[in-house]
Amino acid sequence: MGSYFLEKLGGFTTLFWVALLAIPAVTLASTPEAAASVPAAGGETAWWVWPLVLLIVTFVMGILAVLGGVGGGVLFVPIISGFFPFHLDFVRGAGLLVALSGALAAGPGLLKMNLASLRLAIPVALIASACAIVGAMIGLALPTQIVQTLLGATILGIVAIMLAAKKSELPDVPRADALSTALRINGVYIEGSTGKEIDWKIHRTLPGLILFIVIGVMAGMFGLGAGWANVPVLNLLMGAPLKVSVATSKFLLSITDTSAAWIYLNQGCVIPMMVVPSLVGIMLGSLVGVRILKVAKPTFIRWMVIGLLLFAGAKALTKGLGLPFIV
């Protein structure tokens, strides 16, 4: 009983300190005038202010991303573009690398556990990565206001998906369709909770692959990563088991985001002063988030993430349309 109490107390203490760090960081990010009050040699904002604020804010994002079950890029792009004085191109470039870092860290382990399926990932990745390149080129060619408006609409759409989406641990797939049979997309994995061997196959392969064209374009255009869309398509439409869908989606990000990230890198839209503190903050926050996950209430965290995305999506939409944002 004592250890349980201490564990809970430790979790809430961590949440308290995270909130305490987040308040001044978000306040500073929301008001450039406040940042400008920090003295520097030339009377301008000190060079270390924004990297420090980025580190703190992304640390909080890393915690929320783990607890809310969303990718870091989904939180990073709308929040940083909405409340920080950075150009959207730089934010999208950094957002892709934030999503990519988590995918690269998780990919080898998921393949080793036989949860991520190469047979499922390769045809999907071929389509999504090619379309992500196209999406990145479109995103860089369009005016910033249009991309910002579309980003806000997309984030609000993600909120709707999170509110309405259902999950199916083991979808019922009566028989594999002709395309998945020809590509030999099937597999076996061991369910850790029961020790049973699960044979799986997929159907509705062609509609799923067509949807990944749209997902790839959106991932490249907005720098969000695409885990929020990959899992529902793989799980609910194509019928892959939930664990296989989540693991394959994570592995897919390491391919899709890499292709789009090269476009932003080639155009000079990746700034180390933004990317380095963001990656460090997200990774450290993810480590803390895993610990808090043991004692936090998932339902509360999920609603908190949805509220945060709703707020950031509305901010991005109004910013793109040039409307005043009223809290």
Regions found by a protein language model. Name each.
Residues 97-105, 128-134, 138, 252-259:
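Membrane-embedded alpha-helical segments of transport systems
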Residues 1-64, 82, 88, 112-216, ...:
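Juxtamembrane transmembrane-helix boundary motif
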